[in-house]
């Protein structure tokens, strides 16, 4: 759950949906559905209506300790939970289960993606920061590996082309930002 890596609750839905769209194996969706719903409901309990984000104090790249500079909402973790909600809704549609919750989870995913785009892009620093507006990370223009990589990939639909280009230039201007392992 939330105590075994901050993204643990989000990953089953994402993995199950990726498996389904790759293989067409719907049986796995039915087998995993009870756990997927349990984790979605746990995430619902941690959802901050005002921020439109999941309270997540640890980032995906390092979930052994809390990162207070992110203000309680780490970017990569937020993206992962938004994807989880999106995929939970898709799984429910395909399986015909929990039909009454589909719109709720679709809306939650959309709210989170909108909030991420609005709260994490720092125009002055030309980057997506690891924490939202008001956090130390936002004020100082700090980013974290996983969140940075996720916003840059067009697959996730976070950064606009302009933001992507600016952020890549910002990363390139920091010689210590790149390693042989990634950002």
Question: Which residues fall in each region the model found?
Answer:
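Aromatic-rich carbohydrate-recognition surfaces in CAZymes
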Residues: 1-53, 74-82
């Amino acid at each position: 759950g939330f105590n075994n890596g901050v993204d643990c609750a989000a990953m089953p839905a994402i993995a199950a949906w990726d498996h389904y769209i790759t293989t067409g194996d719907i049986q796995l969706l039915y087998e995993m559905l009870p756990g997927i719903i349990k984790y979605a409901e746990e995430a619902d309990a941690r959802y901050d209506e005002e921020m439109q984000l999941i309270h997540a104090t640890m980032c995906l790249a390092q979930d052994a300790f809390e990162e207070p500079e992110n203000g309680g909402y780490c970017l990569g973790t937020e993206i992962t939970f938004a994807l989880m909600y999106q995929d939970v809704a898709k799984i429910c549609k395909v399986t015909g289960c929990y039909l009454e919750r589909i719109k709720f989870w679709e809306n939650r995913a959309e709210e989170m993606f909108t909030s991420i785009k609005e709260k994490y892009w720092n125009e002055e620093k030309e980057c997506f920061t690891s924490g939202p507006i008001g956090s130390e990370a936002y004020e100082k223009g700090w980013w974290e590996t996983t969140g940075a990589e996720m916003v840059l990939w067009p697959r996730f639909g976070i950064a606009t082309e302009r933001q992507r280009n600016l952020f890549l230039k910002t990363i390139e201007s920091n010689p210590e930002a790149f390693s042989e392992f990634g950002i």
